[in-house]
Swiss-Prot record:
Its cofactor is Mg(2+); K(+). PANTHER family: S-ADENOSYLMETHIONINE SYNTHETASE (PTHR11964). It comes from Geobacillus thermodenitrificans (strain NG80-2). One of its GO terms (biological process) is S-adenosylmethionine biosynthetic process. Residues 101-111 are annotated as: Flexible loop. This is S-adenosylmethionine synthase. The gene is metK. Catalyzes the formation of S-adenosylmethionine (AdoMet) from methionine and ATP. The overall synthetic reaction is composed of two sequential steps, AdoMet formation and the subsequent tripolyphosphate hydrolysis which occurs prior to release of AdoMet from the enzyme. It is found in: Cytoplasm. Binds 2 divalent ions per subunit. Binds 1 potassium ion per subunit. It catalyses: L-methionine + ATP + H2O = S-adenosyl-L-methionine + phosphate + diphosphate. Homotetramer; dimer of dimers. Its main location: cytoplasm.
Length: 404
């Protein structure tokens, strides 16, 4: 590898990974509540360990949902259906410890600071204040069709394929827990040129030989997913590198909601504000503003205004308008970043209520995001992945740039 070339690595995990079990349970509960009560406030955290699921958090709603049933259905759907897997949907204990949202927080969210101070018009009074302070990032680049970095894109597709060959009995000896990792080599212009390394760790039946797992992973998982032109004789493969992965899932490791925030986003390729997504209703800007930031970044790249774009939004609790909007195109912008910020302000309502309305977020759409990434998904229709603003952004940005 020449001195100017570089390697970058991202990882993904399957739906049976302990932390991802928790994300899916939290979002399944959120979806069940939003289906009946779109205005509910939900902050739902899940923890799993051997034989036990604990659901806790703050939920304020007018409806009732059967949390233990949702937990068991989710665990069953993932594939933990037998005690010998170390975790069983029908026999695991389910504990719940649910509170209501703090009235101090609710006060800030229910009526935004600007409205309390009388600074907003009547129609703006409906704007919801941010549920917390914080900063969120959104990112897009033209490395893949879905405008995502290639390492995380391939890692997610490999993880999803692992679950697919297990559930369709192509490889019936696989069990639900698993991880993937992909290292991409970039040339001196920052373009991806080849896959340097692929790591796959998958839980399996104790009687299966390591050599068979290695052969099957290459034939049934890697080959259908990774484009042949990216693989060469120097690509390295590490399949179950410890030699054995029988004990897995919650029996192997405890899991928690919100522990896979880099897997959920851009695989470390872009910055992260630190807030997790799963189990949070859309008044939580950790979630909704991160989705909005991706929506903005993706439309900028789709418009051809930059090859790579990172958007940062920041909020104060109880205040509707973002305290800052920042855009970085890493030297790839076709117009200045000041122009981009202006057209973004003109075309995207980035107040929490504006985001919820723009992306229609008060719907039960979240469980499907809780495994295999929240961004760049081609298998599900997510509103923040649409590029419906690209044309107007391009037109306005180029017009503004002429007047600079």
């Amino acid at each position: 590898m020449s001195a100017k070339r570089r390697l970058f690595t991202s990882e993904s995990v399957t739906e049976g990974h302990p932390d991802k079990i928790c994300d899916q349970i939290s979002d399944a509960i959120l979806d069940a509540i939003l289906e009946k009560d779109p205005n509910a406030r939900v902050a739902c955290e899940t923890s799993v360990t051997t034989g036990l699921v604990l659901v806790s958090g703050e939920i304020t709603t007018s409806t009732y949902v059967d949390i233990p049933r949702i937990v068991r259905d989710t665990v069953r759907e993932i594939g933990y259906t037998r005690a010998k897997f170390g975790f069983d949907a029908d026999t695991c204990a389910v504990l719940t410890a649910i509170d209501e949202q703090s009235p101090d927080i609710a006060m800030g969210v229910d009526q935004a600071l600007e409205a309390r101070e009388g600074q907003m018009t009547d129609e703006e009074i409906e704007a919801i204040g941010a549920g917390d302070q914080g900063l969120m990032f959104g990112f897009a680049c033209n490395e893949t069709e879905e405008l995502m970095p290639l390492p995380i894109s391939l890692a997610h597709r490999l993880s999803r394929r692992l679950a697919e060959v297990r559930k369709t009995d192509v490889l019936p000896y696989l069990r639900p827990d698993g991880k993937t990792q992909v290292t991409i080599e970039y040339d001196e212009n920052g373009k991806p040129v080849r896959v340097d390394t692929i790591v796959i760790s998958t839980q399996h039946h104790p009687e299966i030989e390591h050599d068979q797992i290695e052969r099957d992973m290459k034939e049934h998982v890697i080959k259908p997913i990774v484009p042949a032109e990216l693989l060469d004789e120097n690509t390295k493969y590490f399949i179950n590198p410890t030699g054995r992965f029988v004990i897995g899932g919650p029996q192997g490791d405890a899991g928690l909601t919100g522990r896979k925030i880099i897997v959920d986003t851009y695989g470390g390729y872009a910055r992260h504000g630190g807030g997790a997504f799963s189990g949070k209703d859309p008044t939580k800007v950790d979630r909704s503003a991160a989705y909005a930031a991706r929506y903005v970044a993706k439309n900028i790249v789709a418009a051809g205004l930059a090859d790579k774009c990172e958007v940062q939004l920041a909020y104060a609790i109880g205040v509707a308008r973002p305290v800052s909007i920042s855009i970085d195109t890493f030297g790839t912008g076709k117009v200045s970043e000041d122009v981009l910020i202006e057209v973004v302000r003109n075309n995207f309502d980035l107040r929490p209520a504006g985001i919820i309305k723009m992306l229609d977020l008060r719907r039960p759409i979240y469980k499907q995001t809780a495994a295999y990434g929240h961004f760049g998904r081609t298998d599900v229709d997510l509103p923040w992945e649409r590029t419906d603003k690209a044309a107007v952004l391009k037109e306005q940005a180029l017009a503004l740039a002429k007047n600079e």
